Amino acid sequence: MDRNGANMLDGRVESDAKGSFRKDYTKMENNNNGANISDGIYRIIRSFKSFSHFFIRYEEETKEREAEMEIGFPTDVKHLSHIGVDGTMTTFDNTSSSFPFSGFHLTGTVV
């Protein structure tokens, strides 16, 4: 016992505003050297809970990676038409009736 009357044989002494006191445990101190079945079961359950979190995080990461991979798809796009006029501007005949701007002057020549 220490000077406040608390038992310090197991080294587990707590204190409050009134002084030190020994924490009550549900362990059987004589038969199993401080081992408690409920503490062991609690530790096993806690380890299973923490172990299952690894799989949950892994599933979330794979979903995020799949979402990242889908950005930019589809890559096999077939272009069916072009906006504007096909070919180069030097090959056009500006006197043609199919030319949409035949009424306007191009490069300073009069039609």
Curated annotation (Swiss-Prot):
Membrane topology of the entry: Peripheral membrane protein
Keywords linked to the UniProt accession: Cell membrane, Growth regulation, Membrane
Localization, per the record, is: Cell membrane
Specify the superkingdom.
Eukaryota
Q: Does Disulfide bond appear among the keywords?
A: no
Looking up InterPro entries in the UniProt record yields: CRIB_dom, RIC2/4
Q: Where's the CRIB domain?
A: 71-84
Miscellaneous:
Over-expression of RIC2 in tobacco germinating pollen reduces pollen tube elongation.
Q: What does this protein do?
A: Functions as a downstream effector of Rho-related GTP binding proteins of the 'Rho of Plants' (ROPs) family. Participates in the propagation of ROP GTPase signals in specific cellular responses. Is involved in pollen tube growth regulation through its interaction with ARAC11/ROP1.
What is the protein named?
Answer: CRIB domain-containing protein RIC2
